[in-house]
Amino acid sequence: MSKKKMTVPDFKKYKQEGRKFTYVTAYDYTTASIVNESETEVVLVGDSLGMVMLGYDTTVGVTLDDMIHHIRPVVKGAPDTFVVGDMPFGSYQESPEQAIRSACRILMETNCDCVKLEGGAAMAETIRRMVEVGIPVMGHIGLTPQSASSFGGFKMQGGTPEGAAKLVADAKALEAAGVFSIVLECVPSGVAKAVTEAVGVPILGIGAGPYVDCQVLLTHDLLDMYGDFTPRFVKQFAHIRKAMVEGLNAFHEEALSGQFPTPDYSFNRVVEGYEVSVSYTHLTLPT
């Protein structure tokens, strides 16, 4: 399958045309190459790699070097897919100058297509400065995992009139600052609809209902690869973890029983002095 890679201007164009698209995650070359073979338009190398790939309890421990290390192979594996590089906690909050330096490192050292950072109106000035120097920025509001502890954990946001109004205001502030799209995470469907209608840039929803411009899920969640926890908003479209365990167990059983390897999976060249009698269950060396 061949697909045309999205560009930054395409995001707004898709929204204007009412064209939906999808957005998943990858943290390594192999997964990225699989995503690239699919019809998925956007892939994020998220700081969620801390929890999914490194076993951390939160995303906070992920470093800028970690992100660059994982973004590089995804860019190589998904040349026809728009690649988003996440900015980790502590790499942009200090000042606009720090954010610009960190974003430039990500873009220069990985060749990804944009950076994503978390935060609402409070981050607008930082984003404005980044966009002014030519950095394409994707915003992220609602549940922002890097600051989840201040919300009391990974919980739905915008569940009150005040909270909903703040999300709309945050989205408008980010649009005014120059983001080309905004991730909206874990909010009620009606609130997500209001946010989506309030701005001209696409809203990319994860756990945000059906009215957003783009649906987002973590690949490890939607393919049932992670295993430890599945958010309530995730539908599992395949069960890859189960298939992998079954395959590993089948290999283990055949290797121990002698069913594997058969001659079909062996090098059968005859070497003088080392002839063997081959069966499907054992090899016998000459005495």
Language model feature labels by segment:
Residues V8-F11, Y23, Y27-Y56, V60, ...:
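Alpha/beta enzyme core
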Residues M1-S2, R101, T219-V271:
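Alpha/beta catalytic cores of nucleotide-metabolism and tRNA/nucleoside-modifying enzymes
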